[in-house]
Amino acid sequence: ILLLLLTTKIFSQEMYNLETCETDIAYNVPQFYQDFFQCVKVRLSESGDYVNLYFNAKPPYQTWYYDASNVTSSNNPNWIPFQSTGPGSYQNPGVIAEQEFVISVPVNPTPRQGVIINASTVDGEVTTSDYEYPMGSIGAALNGVTLFNPLAAPGDIIENEAFSFDLYNGHPAGDTYHYHT
């Protein structure tokens, strides 16, 4: 009986996708969040000045970056075998793990004044400008996947890292699946 229960649990795992992910959006957040976000929890801050997005960064589709140890598509329906996306493509060693991210977005953002975007502020190097995004998570995509800046990890080149993107143009850094902006 125990084997039957374990087998049933293993084979009954539901695919994580836009229809099955948890979406919990408060009624009092701006309409944009209600209309476009999925796979997230969205709440207005106590002050009413920020919208807080809570998300797990798991991609709501199939990818080879879900944990493949002892899995098949029958016991992890989100895992698929690696598929080449072209010459030079490869699977990086990262494996997706559920995360707990919170991003706070001002309800009424104010643009920075006097910022000039040129080659010195967008030079592909981290920490050379006060206007660069930090490394790591900088936001949330509409489907609850985390966003990283447009750069690769220090020592890597984003054009080379792109060869490790999956069918949806994402990949993990360690266990954090993400897109680059």
Language model segments and positions:
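Histidine-centered catalytic micro-motifs
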Residues: 174-181
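Solvent-exposed loop and beta-edge segments used for protein-protein assembly and interaction
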Residues: 97, 171-173
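Short, recurring structural edge motifs at helix starts
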Residues: 162-169
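Short helix-loop boundary/capping segments
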Residues: 156-161, 181
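Solvent-exposed N-terminal domain segments of exported/luminal and surface proteins
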Residues: 13-156
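Sec/Tat signal peptide C-region and signal peptidase I cleavage site
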Residues: 8-12
